[in-house]
Design a protein with these regions (language model features):
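Secretory targeting and sorting signals
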Residues: 1-32
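A short beta-strand motif characteristic of beta-propeller blades
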Residues: 30-34, 39, 68-74, 110-116, ...
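Repeated scaffold domains used in trafficking and secretory/extracellular systems
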Residues: 36-44, 77-85, 119-130, 166-187, ...
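Conserved beta-strand positions in repeat-built beta-propeller and related beta-rich domains
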Residues: 44-45, 51-56, 85, 92-97, ...
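Enriched for extracellular/lumenal, surface-exposed ectodomains of secreted and cell-surface proteins
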Residues: 46, 129-130, 315-316, 410-431, ...
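Structural motif
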Residues: 58-61, 99-102, 142-152, 200-209, ...
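Blade-level signature of beta-propeller repeat domains, shared across WD40, Kelch, NHL, RCC1
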Residues: 305-342
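Proline-enriched interdomain boundary motifs that mark the N-terminal boundary
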Residues: 339-348, 440-448, 537-552
């Protein structure tokens, strides 16, 4: 059969309704086709349409060859199998719930006619052959065997002659109660393949070929009582006296009997294209779709799909599959289904030395051997050729292996992609592997490491870059201490003729400075860093003194012996920062530390300390404010000592 496929989904335990139908036709938008459940699918090659019966929604849907919904008709109560007339002018739908065959216009899905079938169950399966439309039916509960009926479209019911005829299956006492599956093939006109296994007793099975070209059906070959495979599907094979039974075994027929001639791995559904290609849905639990060439039992192509039905386009250019999903069965379009899909392996060394030869090898495997002398395209992608450079093509050996040598001029990650363009029997294929090719380490340095600078100093940092290939660009980054200031790019540019490049950094905090070379195809990236340090800005203002004057060579602030000096320190602010207040007194010819205390800075960076007066004259004291890295509440600057302020108390 070249244009249709059927499912064996059984609903014989359902009491079917014979209510009148209301038929509604709707035009669909360009969206994927999903049906609740389906018994039949047929392909119209002339119109490039795929018709699917949706039993869940009592409708027939039409899709284009891209799998998009283009039309639908509802009200086909219990729609089961579908078939196109031999001339393609009529689409027939078996409506099992309303017990009728509905004739539709395949171009519009308008109803052309309805043919009631006086059967207890069915009609279930339908096919066109010998100028008539054939269908199978049965009685409820297995009271009678399944049988064959026909419709003669040339008979006008208004003439008083019923176009529907029942009881035409020429084999009696076969014991199978369920309506049998039908199939026809354009290459063998006038023949029907009939097959089924009994719903109640799977040991009872039926396989037959019937000639329906004459006035009455004539049995050509039959086998009943249990073939060697469950007859859950049947296909009439094109161009010869053979059928495919149960989607698995090929039977030749002659002298009224069947002889098994070949078999495929076990399957449950199948469809056969006019050119003999077989598409098979795997057994329960393995619903992959496999495609077999005529006379071959090894699949040329396999699709990992959870499929329930398949149907060929008449020209075999496409295979249509209903694939199970959360919302039902979705139509999938499989293009070039008869082409073998090559698998290519690429094995390159994991590491290599730049400018040294390396060897890449691999193998091409396919269900159909590549033609002799087949060539593979080789592309190398690296830093110098980011869009790829085509290397000389490599020829595949008779055993499918290949190898080639190359000398990578660029270091870093080098990718070798090996591709086959495809041919009349193969799809395109491609694979790749990567090599880490060595690069030299460039010389890169940066000055000013460990130096300490005054707060806010503008300090030039100079990077020196040694020999490289093409890239002479250096970046200088600064990362000030403290989480509130991120690392930032200060400057980027090309080194001068001496290999130097400078950028000025504002030293408001201790700062890590980076020089970055991003590498080129011969030299690897490199980053160096230095850390330079910045002091805080600190000053102290003295007040409440009555004069200043020197004692020896040192200037003192003079206070009355009972006046408390007020000392206001201004220091670079940072959240949580404290100043250390150092106090010393002079006696016995030297300075002696009295106390050191930490005082918090305000958000304005100021700290005011009032010093208690000694109450006696002749006392000398001095104080200073200090930022201590780590002890002053943070570590973003370097320890900084303020200058001493000298105090003298007099009468």
């Amino acid at each position: 059969m070249g244009t249709r496929s059927i499912s064996i989904a059984t609903a014989l335990a359902v009491v079917f309704s014979s209510a009148a139908l209301t038929v509604v036709v709707t035009a669909g938008s360009a969206s994927a086709v999903t049906v609740g459940s389906s018994w039949g699918m047929v392909v119209d090659g002339a119109r490039h349409r795929v018709f699917i019966g949706d039993d869940t929604r009592d409708k027939v849907v039409a899709a284009d060859y891209n799998g998009n919904l283009v039309d639908s008709v509802s009200g086909i109560d219990g729609v089961a199998d579908l078939a196109l007339s031999e001339d393609g002018s009529t689409l027939y739908a078996a409506a099992r719930a309303s017990h009728e065959i509905v004739a539709l216009d395949p171009a519009t899905l308008d109803v052309k006619a309805r043919y009631p079938v006086a059967a207890g169950s069915g009609p279930l399966y339908v096919e066109a052959a010998g100028g008539k439309v054939w269908f199978t039916y049965g009685e409820w509960g297995g009271e009678t065997e399944s049988d064959l009926g026909s419709i003669d479209p040339a008979v006008d019911p208004a003439s008083g002659t019923d176009p529907v005829s029942l009881g035409q299956f020429p084999l009696h006492d076969h014991g199978v109660t369920g309506p049998a599956i039908l199939d026809a093939d354009p290459s063998t006109p006038g023949l029907l393949a009939v097959g089924q296994r009994d719903f109640y007793d799977s040991a009872k099975q039926l396989l037959a070929v019937v000639d329906v070209s004459g006035p009455a059906p004539r049995l050509v070959a039959s086998q009943s009582g249990g073939p060697t495979v469950y007859v859950n599907d049947v296909d009439l094979l094109p161009g010869g006296s053979a059928v495919l039974g149960g989607a698995t075994k090929r039977y030749a027929y002659a002298d009224g009997a069947f002889t098994e001639t070949a078999s495929y791995p076990y399957g449950q559904r199948a469809d056969v294209a006019p050119n003999g290609l077989v598409a098979q849905v795997g057994p329960v639990g393995d619903y992959r779709v496999s495609v077999y060439r005529p006379g071959e039992s090894k699949a040329v192509r396999t699709y990992a799909l959870d499929a329930s039905q398949v149907a060929w386009a008449p020209d075999a250019s496409r295979l249509f599959a209903l694939v199970s999903g959360p919302g039902g069965d979705t139509l999938r379009v499989l293009t070039n289904p008869a082409l073998s899909v090559p698998a290519i392996t690429v094995n390159a060394p994991s590491t290599a030395t730049r400018a040294k030869p390396l060897t890449v090898s691999g193998k091409v495997t396919a269900t159909v051997k590549l033609p002799a002398g087949a060539q593979l395209k080789v592309t190398r992608t690296d830093m110098e050729y980011p869009n790829g450079k085509t290397l000389p093509a490599v020829t595949v050996k008779a055993d499918g292996t290949y190898s080639f040598c190359d000398t990578p001029s660029s270091g870093g990650t080098v990718t070798y992609q090996v591709s086959y363009a495809g041919d009349a029997e193969h799809t395109p294929a491609s694979a790749y592997d990567k090599v880490a090719v060595s690069r030299a380490t460039p010389s890169l340095s940066l000055n000013n490491n460990g130096k300490v600078y005054a707060y806010g100093a503008d300090v030039p940092f100079t990077a020196h870059l040694g020999s490289t290939y093409k890239n002479r660009t250096v970046e200088i980054w600064a990362d000030p201490f403290g989480s509130d200031r991120p690392k930032k790019l200060i400057k980027s540019g090309t080194v001068n003729s001496h290999g130097n490049f400078s950028a000025v950094v504002d030293m408001a905090r201790d700062t890590t400075v980076y020089a970055v070379f991003k590498g080129d195809s011969h030299y690897k990236p490199r980053t160096v860093k230095v850390t330079a340090y910045a002091k805080v800005r600190v000053s102290t203002a003295v007040s409440r003194h009555y004069k200043t004057g020197k004692i020896g060579s040192t200037t003192y602030y003079w206070f009355h012996k009972r006046t408390n000096p007020l000392l206001t320190t201004t220091m670079t602010y940072y959240p949580g920062r404290h100043q250390r207040f150092d106090l010393q007194a002079y006696y016995q010819g030297s300075w002696h530390s009295l106390d050191s205390q930490y005082f918090a800075l305000g958000t304005n960076g100021k700290s005011v300390v009032e010093l208690g007066a000694p109450g006696e004259a002749g006392v000398k004291a001095r104080m200073r404010s200090v930022y201590v890295n780590g002890s002053s509440g943070d570590s973003v600057n370097s320890t900084t000592y303020g200058g001493w302020k000298y105090l003298y108390f007099s009468n």
